[in-house]
Amino acid sequence: MMITLRKLPLAVAVAAGVMSAQAMAVDFHGYARSGIGWTGSGGEQQCFQTTGAQSKYRLGNECETYAELKLGQEVWKEGDKSFYFDTNVAYSVAQQNDWEATDPAFREANVQGKNLIEWLPGSTIWAGKRFYQRHDVHMIDFYYWDISGPGAGLENIDVGFGKLSLAATRSSEAGGSSSFASNNIYDYTNETANDVFDVRLAQMEVNPGGTLELGVDYGRANLRDNYRLVDGASKDGWLFTAEHTQSVLKGFNKFVVQYATDSMTSQGKGLSQGSGVAFDNEKFAYNINNNGHMLRILDHGAISMGDNWDMMYVGMYQDINWDNDNGTKWWTVGIRPMYKWTPIMSTVMEIGYDNVESQRTGDKNNQYKITLAQQWQAGDSIWSRPAIRVFATYAKWDEKWGYDYNGDSKVNPNYGKAVPADFNGGSFGRGDSDEWTFGAQMEIWW
């Protein structure tokens, strides 16, 4: 009995410590991928992306180690009111050695307060750096609506027929603005702050199993006093988005239409590039003139076709029409079927095609890419992760144009512009060729 009594304080202390640890538990989430690959003609794994396309089909076609490590915690709660602190640090290396030093990217650090406004139950106030309501196509790693960055907002306001969200974020360009210099010389190497103001109305039930989301984004260059932009800079622009999501075959289908103007056309996802400049090989700012418009029509989804088959798919048309004729027309179509041999083993195939036409030359670049992978994953869904896969990829391309980045923009009037593949006896784009790669990769999110 004496021994039991002596052990009691220790047991109480341990229990209190466990309860305290549970109360202060930190949420750990993230994403990572890494692997090793070879190229059929020799050397390390090559990855294949069509010149002018903004993404590539990713299965068996990723050549880097990438990770996002998220730590977060609910730091205060009283009734239904709470504060949550969230962080995210990302890393990317070329996966060529054991020791690969890299500077981390501090991508998220924000606080979200839920139900803090009595007359707006269910809403969230937030401020800080944040991945904000991002919309993407997983199989091509393409974010078509993403205003992430430092910002603040009020989201998920219940308006009866949907949820209203308001936000403002910042996306600064590395250069583009200039202060006065002697002899009226401007270098345009100062950072340009771009503000984006976002309004969304989501979760509107428009048909059985279907919801509609509408959004408007306005972006503008926010100059400091006595600074100026390059003559003809776009300064501002708009992005309009409509997305219909339909529940179908134990999955979903998303149909998206987007239209953007001027500064919102460069990235086409909601981030503004108001100064409209870039830097050449000599770090000299040159005008890329993103005045114009963009139209994007996109359909993508993931479905289940019986007990053994799942499939992802995408089809997209995008037309960037710039006043300087340096835009592109890009269309892409692809599928990723998955056959499940057991609840944890599957065979996955990805077939994708890209075609990009240059507005300036009228020429087209195209690429076919096919990957076959044997995969072991934590579950029987096409979304199940972690996954370990061995793969073989074949790509064939024929490119008739490329971008001219020879010399610098002060002496090369075509710098940064699309030119035919054999322009001035040179070689632009990737030509007409094909290649095999093979390897192994892990992918995880949690």
Swiss-Prot record:
Its main location: membrane. It comes from the Bacteria. Residues 1-25 form the signal peptide. Residues 36-64, 94-104, 131-148, 174-191, 223-234, 264-290, 324-326, 360-362, 401-430 are extracellular. Residues 26, 79-80, 116-122, 160-161, 206-209, 249-250, 306-307, 342-343, 379-385, 446 are periplasmic. Keywords: Cell outer membrane, Disulfide bond, Ion transport, Membrane, Porin, Signal, Sugar transport, Transmembrane, Transmembrane beta strand, Transport. The record marks Y31, Y66, W99, F252, W383, W445 as: Greasy slide, important in sugar transport. The record marks Y143 as: Important in sugar transport. It is a multi-pass membrane protein. The chain crosses the membrane at residues 27-35, 65-78, 81-93, 105-115, 123-130, 149-159, 162-173, 192-205, 210-222, 235-248, 251-263, 291-305, 308-323, 327-341, 344-359, 363-378, 386-400, 431-445. It is found in: Cell outer membrane. GO terms for biological process: monoatomic ion transport. Gene3D superfamilies: Porin, LamB type. Disulfide bonds join C47-C63. GO terms for cellular component: cell outer membrane; pore complex. It holds the Pfam family LamB. Induction: By maltose. It catalyses: beta-maltose(in) = beta-maltose(out). HAMAP family: LamB. Homotrimer formed of three 18-stranded antiparallel beta-barrels, containing three independent channels. PANTHER family: CRYPTIC OUTER MEMBRANE PORIN BGLH-RELATED. This is Maltoporin.
